[in-house]
Amino acid sequence: MEEAFQLALDSAPFLLKGAYYTVILSLGGMFFGLVMGFGLALMRLSRFKSVSWLARIYVSFFRGTPLLVQLFVIYYGLPQLGIELDPLPAALIGFSLNMAAYACEILRAAISSIERGQWEAAASIGMTRAQTLRRAILPQAMRTALPPLGNSFISLVKDTALAATIQVPELFRQAQLITARTFEVFTMYLAAALIYWILATVLSHLQNKLEERVNRHDQES
């Protein structure tokens, strides 16, 4: 037991380096996923059926296929089309595209939950649809979308372990490499699991604090 604990301590710098890549992938995937997801949500809500259906097809594909398969298509498949990507950019693109599909549905549902009368009231005072969306609808919709978006972000942190399959040196990959050298399977994978758990716990705490702050602001106003 003492030797296993010492090994975990000695391996900490490598695991923390992997955790750094895990955080980078998570933050990048969430940021780009939100940006694309918002655009897709607007497409889903479009009055033009062709535009709406394009977004529907995108969401259906990325929600209906395994994330691991999507990563393999990007990293191993695209080179056959002349598009070669390094592991980290390939993983970031894969996570962003996947997150965009889920963010799209979360944001679409949140925007749709706002009463139609608010759009009509804004139009009656001369506001354009873009102004109404930015000033009136989005602030309310984001309060509704915050909990599921936070949960999706926590899930993304755990899903980044899949990047190990395309050689990204994130947390799980580092644990694999150390295990291959030391054969201490239980110790290293447990150490990696604890770091994932710490990251998820911190994010969950931050999410709860943010939700409490938003709710308190709503009550005060």
Q: Across the structure, where does each feature detected by a protein language model lie?
A:
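Transmembrane alpha-helices and adjacent helix-loop boundaries
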Residues: M1-S221
